[in-house]
Amino acid sequence: MGYIITKTVSIVLISFLFTIIHYLVIIIIQSTTKSEKIDGDRFLNNIWFYLIFFLFFGLFLLLITLIVEKPAVIFTLGIFLILIVPFIQPFIPMIPNIGDDIQDSFKYIPFTYLTEKMTGEIKFSHWQWFISIASIVVLFIANMLYASKRDI
């Protein structure tokens, strides 16, 4: 159980590190282009977004790592989820009869809306907040149970 808690804490620290790097890049770009300052609310939104993004994908891939134990599968799945899914998503409505329904359901699947928000506006609906946090809790519990079952 200590292994999973340590991994989760490291994921949280990495998310804070990425937030700080992201914010520093924004400050450097703002100072070189003499644009308006970024407000503090946007910075706080970025902290929450990166925390949710890294915890969700980190805990999901950690669970897959515990189950599969093959690094190539985890690497391929990570690339697929973060790079390929957003590329394929605009083509889903072209599927006859069910494409629009699938596209509507993407608003409630963290794999799709978290990667979509990486390149767009970081605004969550109430359901997306709930689904994200609930998914993180479920993934954390699943990791704990699987790790205790394997005696890690």
Each model region followed by its residue ranges:
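Short cytosolic juxtamembrane segments of multi-pass membrane proteins
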Residues: 147-152
